[in-house]
Curated annotation (Swiss-Prot):
NCBIfam families, per database record: rpsL_bact
PANTHER family: 30S RIBOSOMAL PROTEIN S12 FAMILY MEMBER
Annotated protein name in UniProt: Small ribosomal subunit protein uS12
Organism of derivation: Bdellovibrio bacteriovorus (strain ATCC 15356 / DSM 50701 / NCIMB 9529 / HD100)
One Pfam family it belongs to: Ribosom_S12_S23
GO molecular function: rRNA binding; structural constituent of ribosome; tRNA binding
Record GO cellular component, one term: small ribosomal subunit
Length: 124
C-alpha cells in the first residue's frame, strides 16, 4: 500500500485490459491468405490430429488458426476469413477460420448447427 507522499509523487495508473485477439485490430473478422496448412497434436490429456493453418492477415500479422468441422478444402494460397476464439487444447491457436466464406467451403452433409459450419439448408 503506497504512502500519501508516494501517491503525490506519482498517481495510480489504470491498468488496461489486454485483448485476447490482438491480430484482429479491434475488427470482428479479418481476411488472410494461408501460408501453411497442417495438423498438430493437442495438449496432454487429449489425443488427436487437429487441422490448423498459418495465415498471413491483410494487416500484416501472421497467426495460427483452427479449421473447424470434418474435412476441408484448404491449401496454400487459399483466401480465408478469420474470427477470434481460441482452441483450449492447442497452445498458440487463438483464432478460428470461418467456414463457407471465401475459399473455404462449408461442411458437407451437416444437418445440425449448420450456420456455424457454413452449410446450406438441405433439399427435402
Amino acid at each position: 500500500m503506497p504512502t500519501i507522499n508516494q501517491l503525490i509523487k506519482s498517481e495510480r495508473t489504470v491498468q488496461k485490459n489486454q485483448t485476447k485477439s490482438p491480430a484482429l485490430d479491434s475488427c470482428p473478422q479479418r481476411r488472410g491468405v494461408c501460408t501453411r496448412v497442417y495438423t498438430t497434436t493437442p495438449k496432454k490429456p487429449n489425443s488427436a490430429l487437429r487441422k490448423v493453418a498459418k495465415v498471413r492477415l491483410s494487416n500484416g500479422f501472421e497467426v495460427i488458426s483452427y479449421i473447424p468441422g470434418i474435412g476441408h478444402n484448404l491449401q496454400e494460397h487459399s483466401v480465408v476469413l478469420i474470427r477470434g476464439g481460441r482452441v483450449k487444447d492447442l497452445p498458440g491457436v487463438r483464432y478460428h477460420i470461418v467456414r463457407g466464406v471465401l475459399d473455404l467451403q462449408g461442411v458437407n452433409g451437416r444437418l445440425r448447427a449448420r450456420s456455424k459450419y457454413g452449410t446450406k439448408r438441405p433439399k427435402k
